[in-house]
Amino acid sequence: HIMQPLFDEKTMEVHKKHLQDRTNVRSPLATNEVGFDPRTGFPNNFIGGHVTMKPVIASHFNYRASLIRQMEWHGIRWRALPSESRDLYLHFRSLDLSAVDRIMLDCYSARGPKPRQPSCMLRSLLIMVATKCPTIPQWVETLHVSPFYALLSGFDPDDVPGVGTFYDFLDRLWALSTPNFSSHIKPPYKRELKKPKEKGAKAASVEKESVADLIVRLSTTVFSANQEAYGLMFQIFRTCFVNESIRRGLVRPDRLCIAGDGTPVVTAARFRSHHTCDCWKKGIFNCNCNRFFPQPDCDIGWDSSREHWYFGYDLYLLTDADSQLPLFPALHQASKHDSHGFCEAFFRFRALAPDLKPASLLLDSAHDSMAMYKLCQREGITPYIDLNLGNTKKTTDYHGVTLGPDGIPVCPAGLKMKSNGNDLNRQYAKFRCPLNNNGTCTCEHPCSDAKYGRTCSIAMETNIRLYTSPPRPSDEWKLMYNKRTASERVNKQIKLDYMLEACKHHCTKYLVCPRLSYHDADPPFQMEGPVIHMTVA
């Protein structure tokens, strides 16, 4: 509904005729494109004795003032707009993107044609995502048809940027010289696809490097925002959105609880490649020569939710579990295992946002490995990771006590013993008789002379993966782990509500575009509309 023109054809003709009658009068937005310094009287872009073509750093107050004057100039009353357009107006009128002009100042040359304001370009892309417009050409057409969207973006309706201008802006956000992470020319893709045996299970890892070796390698790697492909975009995301959420009390850095999860991103229906040799002319069709891959960063992965193979990416997202707001996205190949995807995202997030140190970590059973617990122990993080019984031996023996695959002792009657908390001073996990009823053992064949039944204490250092603090079966652990579903809700919102999979681009650069996540919240003070939090997907 909000993609329809705000005026009918007759009203638009009257509107255009009214503007033609005032051709000699410049609109308020046009007269405020370049401000003047009140001390010198020169324009703000008059630097070093000449006029520079770098973007003018404008404040959010100037944008709001120009927006109000422009809407009055064009006869648009925001209270008379449809409810969807009115919500957009309230959201983006309060969204401060003035820091984008300062951050991207070095991305523009001092010579050449005058550029568009980076804050207006980014705001227009965010409005495009909010209105679920799938492509940039369709969005440019919408800006020409509906003046409201042009005004809300910060443009003059008679001077709307073209399609190439938007793609040029996306090129400036991308730090690499190539549009993809890898080369188009690769050896032929030959991998045996093995479907998981259990329903809902994830595919086995195809990584040649173990999680422990990957953690060691990433720990010694230096990550810089200037070297990362999306480093500039994350700097904008951190400055304009994450810091604003921290200021409003939605994200609390002192007790940050991070939930991580990966989600499939489908980009094509099938895997495609082209021959770069002439072996087919000789009758050789299955040669081992290099192939040309249109989407070199994509491959085949397993979607455990829909239970089918897909071609595309794997989006791994670190989410604040308390506020259900995204913190850091990472885009990998579809075959990337979640444990490796987490390590890639975690170490980059730690390097690009060193002041945001997580206090707890919520992960599913795909991340269950001893190396992950040792990483959390070294970083001072409390892990809440679901146990993967496939990574544990069936039965073990600990000083005459039989342990199950989940590390819980099993009494001679074949019953699992109940957790009795942890002794943190002595670093012991305590267990008691499962038939203990109000301090009395009700077992018909007690295995201990004690009145309250048999007890068992196991050193937590024996296996920090099995004996966690708080204990895995406890109510405290379960209550905390239930917050992990926040990452799944955010993934769903990015993919479905904001149409991430609708971006059918053949390169990673144009897929890495701003995506919005709207979350209703009750901040400690009054604000206009829901909180806006952006993810770079």
Feature roles, as predicted:
Residues 19-22:
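Short hydrophobic targeting helices and cationic amphipathic motifs
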Residues 35-121, 126-130, 151, 157, ...:
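Dynamic "connector" segments at or just before major functional cores
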Residues 138-153:
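DNA-recognition alpha helix
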Residues 168-360, 365-378, 386-388:
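Polybasic low-complexity intrinsically disordered regions
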Residues 374-491:
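Helix-centered, glycine/charged polyanion-binding patches within enzymatic domains
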Residues 477-537:
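Basic, amphipathic alpha-helical segments enriched in Lys/Arg and hydrophobic/aromatic residues
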